[in-house]
Amino acid sequence: MSSGALFPSLVPGSRGSSSKYLVEFRAGKMSLKGSTVTPDKRKGLVYIQQTDDSLIHFCWKDRTSGSVEDDLIIFPDDCEFKRVSQCTTGRVYVLKFKAGSKRLFFWMQEPKTDKDEEYCRKVNEYLNNPPMPGALGGSGSGGHELSALGGEGGLQSLLGNMSHNQLMQLIGPTGLGGLGGLGALTGPGLASLLGSGGPTTSSSSSSSRSQSAAVTPSSTTSSTRTTSAPAAPAAAPATTPSPAVSSNDGASAATSPTQPIQLSDLQNILATMNVPATGEGGQQVDLASVLTPEIMAPILANAEVQERLMPYLPSGESLPQTADEIQNTLTSPQFQQALSMFSAALASGQLGPLMSQFGLPADAVDAANKGDIEAFAKAMQTTSSQKERESSEKKEEEEDMSLD
């Protein structure tokens, strides 16, 4: 499976990490079978970590072997951590994802119960309101703020001078969450930043981290517990906690518009912005719920489509560029998560100026400005049909000329 290479932060050792965890506590895993959760008796540790790329990781590791079995990249409002009150035989907690039915259960192994609520509160706090880069014991500024892009040689010049490859890099695996963050622009917004040469004095951005969340399958191997560890809870019925909406606090900072803006700066800025839950107009369409494996299967069976998609597969000695790999990549949880983020960003109505940089037709850009995903899809489909028709007509003309 190529998902690790498609999203480099999921590859072990590909990102540096801070030596100090934001929060950690001893807890075991629980496996969900049908409607019942069963405790895994191994000694474990749950911890939240912010890596050097500013992403927030929710992790579980085996304290005996030191093996990290679960490493989830979480962005704000993606999930909630809460106690399962229905379980009376132990201190059971669930990490409930708001999109879909994914749930991960854990049982507390801390000998004392006095800090259970504090651990739970901190987990939700760091998952839904991640600290800004440099906020934890660092003296650095967190990089350029968006307001600096409004000055001379700012965002409009930067985007206008980007090559297609650079733009793809901006919204690619490491910047895709940044693309979604465009929808959270406040103040003048992206459109006015592109059209205005006047610098602003401050900018507001949400302290969010974005990337697709992935779950590493856990092992079922058990190891002997020490006698000092709390007793594992009895098997309990699985419950579905109601999700609670968390708000993200903004952070403002004055910046100098005279600082040169690099592609990496813009990418980092976009990566710290939150994706809005819904667009301003109409009902939001989630592309991940539309482009399902069942719908994509006949399309991906087309040899011409496979040939066009092949160059975009992750490259590497151990990553075969095959039709099967296309199927694996497009149906991976990481890709589906990224697709949902793009849907939210497109529905925000802030992507029109960026879409125009790709040379998309005016109808598609207009739809992106309005946050109308359905109109955007229709415009792209119309353009594709026109190009196919023109290509076919050109081919027929060439054949007629060769016959003459």
From Swiss-Prot:
CDD domains xrefs: PH_Rpn13 (cd13314)
Q: Name one GO cellular component term.
A: proteasome complex
Q: Which UniProt keywords apply?
A: Cytoplasm, Nucleus, Proteasome
Spans of biased composition, class Low complexity? 195-247
Which GO biological-process labels does this protein carry? Answer: proteasome assembly
Which residues belong to the signal peptide in this entry? none
Q: Which InterPro entries does the UniProt record give?
A: DEUBAD_dom, Rpn13/ADRM1, Rpn13/ADRM1_Pru, Rpn13/ADRM1_Pru_sf, RPN13_DEUBAD, RPN13_DEUBAD_sf
Q: Name one Pfam family in it.
A: RPN13_C
**Residue ranges under compositional bias (Basic and acidic residues)?**
386-395
Q: Which GO terms describe its molecular function?
A: endopeptidase activator activity
**Domain (Pru): residue spans on this chain:** 17-130
Q: Which domain of life is it from?
A: Eukaryota
Where in this chain does the record put each DEUBAD domain? 278-390
- List every stretch annotated Disordered: 195-258, 377-404
Role summary: Component of the 26S proteasome, a multiprotein complex involved in the ATP-dependent degradation of ubiquitinated proteins. This complex plays a key role in the maintenance of protein homeostasis by removing misfolded or damaged proteins, which could impair cellular functions, and by removing proteins whose functions are no longer required. Therefore, the proteasome participates in numerous cellular processes, including cell cycle progression, apoptosis, or DNA damage repair. Within the complex, functions as a proteasomal ubiquitin receptor.
What do we know about how this protein assembles, alone or with others?
Component of the 19S proteasome regulatory particle complex. The 26S proteasome consists of a 20S core particle (CP) and two 19S regulatory subunits (RP).
Family assignment from sequence similarity: Belongs to the ADRM1 family.
Task: Write down the PANTHER family for this protein, in alphabetical order.
Answer: ADHESION REGULATING MOLECULE 1 110 KDA CELL MEMBRANE GLYCOPROTEIN, PROTEASOMAL UBIQUITIN RECEPTOR ADRM1
What's the protein called, per UniProt?
A: Proteasomal ubiquitin receptor ADRM1
